[in-house]
From Swiss-Prot:
Keyword Chaperone set for record: yes
Pfam families per UniProt: HSP70
Organism placement in taxonomy: Bacteria, Pseudomonadati, Pseudomonadota, Betaproteobacteria, Rhodocyclales
Domain of life: Bacteria
Organism: Azoarcus sp. (strain BH72)
Name listed for the protein in its UniProt record: Chaperone protein HscA homolog
Biological processes annotated in GO: iron-sulfur cluster assembly
Reported function: Chaperone involved in the maturation of iron-sulfur cluster-containing proteins. Has a low intrinsic ATPase activity which is markedly stimulated by HscB.
Alphabetically ordered keywords of this record: ATP-binding, Chaperone, Nucleotide-binding
Family according to the record: Belongs to the heat shock protein 70 family.
Gene Ontology molecular-function annotations: ATP binding; ATP hydrolysis activity; ATP-dependent protein folding chaperone; unfolded protein binding
Record-linked PROSITE patterns: HSP70_1 (PS00297), HSP70_2 (PS00329), HSP70_3 (PS01036)
Length: 622
């Protein structure tokens, strides 16, 4: 749905003027920019008619920067200063980057995000990506004849908060106003759905250069609803290249290659992979720096066999996404293929076998994401045509919650919740007179904080002193349409408030993102048992503390035998609390409750008598 354009009366500047907005697919291997012209989404080409811009940036010693096709020839001759696949480094520390040893770059493991040393100094992946975005912005402004209102930039559905924030930072450096960060599979579904007037449940299989996502969407009368999403933020076409590169090293008995030789062979491996899409075999020929000649032939069958484990790895997220949506493969009306890597025949074959139908390939898998992003950008810019009556409902991929007493996770926003979303939940104090509360925001599917990803911490101070459990603290989670999170806490009686905009310093590791849901499923039983134990331990602590407080205040109401009975019940509960049987702890809590029933009744009577002393009965009558 188009955003409503609001202005003061008489102050609306050219209300009917078409606003220049674009969709950008910032890809690992290639990037594109698209816009809507005459109601149709089209990719914008450079002066030589090329729509795709290689995601390559070269820093030269003279201070100049080359981007795209101009930088590509220097991958082998100047590998340290020619940065390829920078998207794989966005929001990540060095330990999170796969195949570091095979890369020619001079890495610096800086706090928060890995950096690369170049002839122009240390560069972050954000700066490298900004150069690509700047080149696309300049291409768009030259093609459209004016400055851009803004851009919708696509990101993998499984990009975490740090990676999304890094993408927005790169756009700002490039002079772009970000209208929305849009998940790549969702953008593809928008392009496919509007192009084909499709309705029903569709799966989007998105295998890019560095990431994989599977999203399940329901398309109905112009509503694009994401039912579920799953994926692997460190699996893509580059991994297929790397496997073929390793095969070449093994067959040619090269170990270890020089930086320049490694880059040459990696490029030859990628060329061979692309040839195998159309041919049954491909020749890999390369002259090494030593003068040695590499001359190998790889068949399509051999390549499929050596990368079968990677294809299988994509099917895990496929199964999980369908399970989360409550669907079976036969419930899917069509499978939209996205990303150049999906052109590989054994990928097409595996998807067809799993879903029992041939995947949809009537839109260019390299361009479909940019085309969908352009459609969304056109709507968000306010260029709404009469037929543009549609709504986009995206989701959050992993649950968000808070740490509670005992190291437990209270999930506030469950995974696959529709974006944007705001969810509030009330919490209370644990101790009498508590005037502050610390909040720990976490992300993940496990029951214990130790098994989830820490996102942020903040404190709420100035809570009025009250009895334990009397204060009401309302905590609100807000996730915007870009998938970025903010959390606020407010004490309801006093109005004191604190908040935090979640900006983690680095992203989830590869295994953490792809494994969170798997671990959540596999360990659900153990997690629930651990949660039950922690809950009973916390309740035991609360009951013991409350009982001891009552004994200190009104112990004189008990005789020696009664006091001894309650003390014995407290000691027994303390011993049980140190154990691992949550049922035994629950029984101990119940036993202490029974032991204090008479004491509680006497305290109530004592309080009532104290309140009535010195007053006449008619004073309390109305």
């Amino acid at each position: 749905m188009a955003l409503l354009q609001i202005a003061e009366p008489g102050m609306s500047a050219e209300p009917h003027k078409h606003r220049l907005a674009v969709g950008i697919d910032l890809g690992t291997t290639n990037s594109l920019v698209a816009t809507v012209r005459n109601g149709l989404s089209v990719c914008l080409a450079d002066e030589e008619g090329r729509a795709m811009l290689p995601s390559i940036v070269r820093y030269r010693a003279d201070g100049a920067v080359q981007v795209g096709h101009a930088a590509a020839p220097f991958q082998a001759t100047d590998p340290k200063n020619t940065i390829v696949s920078a998207k794989r480094f966005m929001g990540r520390g060095l330990k999170d980057v796969a195949y570091v040893e095979a890369m020619p770059y001079d890495f610096e493991d800086a706090p928060g995000m890995v950096r690369l040393r170049t002839v122009q100094g240390v560069k972050s992946p954000v700066e490298v990506s900004a150069e690509i975005l700047r080149a696309l912005r300049e291409r768009a402004e030259a093609s459209l004849g004016g400055p851009l209102t803004g851009a919708v930039i696509t990101v993998p559905a499984y990009f975490d908060d740090a990676q999304r924030q890094a993408t927005k930072d790169a756009a700002r450096l490039a002079g772009l106003e970000v209208l929305r960060l849009l998940n790549e599979p969702t953008a593809a579904a928008v392009a496919y759905g509007l192009d084909n007037a499709a309705e029903g449940v569709y799966a989007v299989y998105d295998l890019g250069g560095g990431t994989f996502d599977l999203s399940v969407l329901k398309l109905s009368r112009g509503v694009f609803e994401v039912l579920s999403t799953n994926g692997d933020a460190a699996l893509g076409g580059d991994d297929f290249d790397h496997r073929l590169f390793c095969w070449v090293l093994d067959k040619a008995r090269i170990a270890p290659p020089s930086t320049e030789d490694a880059r040459r062979l990696q490029l030859k491996a990628r060329e061979a992979k692309e040839l195998l899409t159309a041919c049954e075999s491909a020749q890999i020929q390369c002259r090494l720096a030593s003068g040695e000649e590499v001359d190998l032939v790889v068949t399509r069958e051999a390549f499929a066999e050596m990368t079968a484990h990677l294809v299988k790895k994509t099917l895990g997220p496929v199964r999980k996404a369908l399970r989360d949506a409550g669907l079976a493969p036969e419930d899917i009306k069509g499978v939209v293929m996205v990303g150049g890597a999906t052109r590989m025949p054994h990928i097409q074959r595996a998807v067809a076998e799993y879903f029992g139908q041939e995947p949809l390939n009537n839109l260019d898998p390299d361009k479909v994401v940019a085309l969908g992003a352009a459609i969304q950008a056109n709507v968000l810019a306010g260029n709404r045509a009469s037929e543009d009556d549609w709504l986009l409902l995206d989701v959050i991929p992993l649950s968000l919650g808070l740490e509670t007493m005992g190291g437990l996770v209270e999930k506030v926003v469950p995974r696959n919740s529709t974006l944007p979303i705001a969810r509030a939940q009330e919490f209370t104090t644990f101790k009498d007179g508590q005037t502050a509360m610390a909040f720990h925001v976490v992300q993940g599917e496990r029951e214990l904080v130790a098994d989830c990803r820490s996102l942020a911490r903040f404190e709420l101070r100035g809570i009025p002193p009250m009895a334990a459990g009397a204060a009401r603290i309302r905590v609100t989670f807000q996730v915007d349409a870009d998938g970025l999170l903010s959390v606020s806490a407010r004490e309801m009686s006093s109005g004191v408030e604190a908040s935090v905009l979640v900006k983690p310093s680095y992203g989830l590791s590869d295994d953490e993102i792809s494994g969170m849901l798997r671990e959540g499923m596999e360990r659900a039983g153990d997690d629930m048992a651990a949660r039950a134990l922690r809950e009973q331990q916390v309740e035991a602590d609360r009951v013991i503390e409350a009982t001891e407080h009552a004994l200190a205040a009104d112990g004189s109401l008990l005789n020696a035998e009664e006091r001894a009975s309650i003390d014995a019940a407290i000691d027994a509960l303390r011993a049980l609390r140190a154990g691992t049987d949550h049922r035994a702890i629950k029984a101990g809590i119940d036993a202490l409750s029974r032991a204090t029933d008479e004491f509680a009744a006497r305290r109530m009577d004592h309080s009532i008598r104290a309140a009535l002393t010195g007053h006449k009965l008619d004073e309390f009558q109305t």
